[in-house]
């Protein structure tokens, strides 16, 4: 049997379509344009294809993480076949000054965690300034973002492990100073 280019193209096309429908497909990224309804409804819909391929892996609460490392837990809302970022979404949007016309790129990491890159209306990635978020003291690895007001009380608060780390750094500095003083004494004696 002679295989022609058309036969190869049809076979490739069929196998490509089958791999796209595979529920184990590695679709990990999607983007969303922030529409007026997103801001008005205070929730954002996850694209249907992503839901079809990855929706069963998502727990009731997901974590959004920005490139600056800020994390926010968002409760999902399931309506029929649709899944929406819901409770916590409007606070995340407000904390990052997300507005109509912004473009968001979501990358699913695992364990219901998404990395979110935010592009503003100029089509450039937004800055993620520290003073645009409100960090709540927490003993776990999740830093909660709650709004634009960043008061000095929370600025000065540290998690217990950060306080412990500061103590260790202080002890290392003290030991270094003592070591340098001892070396200076040896040089003067010697």
Curated annotation (Swiss-Prot):
Record has Nucleus as a keyword: yes
Polar residues bias spans: 12-23
Region of interest (Disordered), ranges: 1-25
GO molecular function ontology, one term from the record: DNA binding
Residue ranges of the annotated DNA-binding region, renumbered to this chain: 29-122
Subcellular locations according to the entry: Nucleus
Keyword Isomerase: no
Chief localization: nucleus
InterPro entries associated with the record: B3_DNA-bd (IPR003340), DNA-bd_pseudobarrel_sf (IPR015300), Plant_B3_domain (IPR050655)
Protein name: B3 domain-containing protein At4g01580
Taxonomic path: Eukaryota, Viridiplantae, Streptophyta, Embryophyta, Tracheophyta
């Amino acid at each position: 049997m002679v295989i022609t280019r058309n036969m190869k193209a049809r076979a490739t096309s069929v196998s490509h379509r089958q791999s796209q429908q595979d529920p184990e497909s590695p679709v990990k990224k999607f983007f969303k344009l922030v529409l007026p309804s997103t801001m008005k409804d205070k929730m954002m819909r996850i694209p249907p294809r992503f839901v079809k391929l990855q929706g069963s892996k998502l727990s009731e609460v997901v974590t959004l993480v920005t490139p600056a490392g800020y994390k926010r837990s968002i409760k999902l809302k399931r309506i029929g076949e649709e899944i929406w970022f819901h409770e916590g979404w409007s606070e995340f949007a407000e904390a990052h000054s997300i507005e109509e016309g912004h473009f968001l790129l979501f990358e699913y990491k695992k364990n219901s965690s998404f990395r979110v890159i935010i592009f503003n209306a100029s089509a450039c990635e937004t800055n993620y300034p520290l003073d645009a978020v409100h960090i709540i003291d927490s003993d776990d690895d999740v830093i909660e973002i709650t709004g634009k007001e960043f008061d000095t009380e929370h600025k000065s608060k540290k998690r217990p492990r950060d306080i412990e780390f500061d103590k260790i750094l202080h002890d290392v500095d003290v030991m270094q100073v003592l070591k340098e003083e001892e070396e200076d004494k040896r040089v003067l004696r010697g």
